[in-house]
Amino acid sequence: IMFKGTDKFGTSNYEAERPYLKQIEKLYEEYRHITDPAKRKVWYHKIDSVSQIAAQYNIPNEYDKLMAAIGSQGTNAYTSNDVTCYVENIPSNEIDSWAKVQGDRFQNMVIRGFHTELEAVYEEYNMGLTSDGRKLFTALMAKLFPNHPYGTQTTIGRGEHLKNPSIVNIKNYFHKYYVPNNIAICLSGDLDPDKTITTIEKYFGSWKPSTHI
């Protein structure tokens, strides 16, 4: 989701795209409260139809193209029990270009292409169900930490979570935890510390901390 862009990139026309994204968000909120299988199928067809319209404004992989344009390599992300980490290997003379894009996406993330991303996560979840190692680790953590998120919640979530997704909840999570007082920017390499700090302040300095952390 974090690689899909903002209101400034990842879209050919955000003002035209936004109403459809809002509609998709609303449809998902209604979908997650429907229990009848036949009605859920009809509702998901609605979501798919609106998503296809919204996709007309989507510019696929624009984030990757922006990073490639500045010579970045190793674009990646991972989530563990304690951290979600985003990784880039960039030329030292492209710090400003990198920070401009990162400052935008971490403050102004737009959720687009949600249903296709959800399907990819669900496929990963299903693969985990057939992995003996994954099942053993999950059972071990549940025994070791019965009253702690380490044992009660896996990073990918449960099947019922994926079957009843909420873009509203994702946005709430983003606004609560993707905040400067809960994030560390780690840089190493051929850097001028003073210039780098000035650049970080330029693109991240207006980011408001959360009072809920």
Q: Could you say what each language-model-derived stretch is?
A:
Residues 1-8:
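Active-site recognition of the HExxH zinc-binding catalytic motif
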Residues 10-213:
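Charge-rich, well-structured scaffold segments of protease-associated domains
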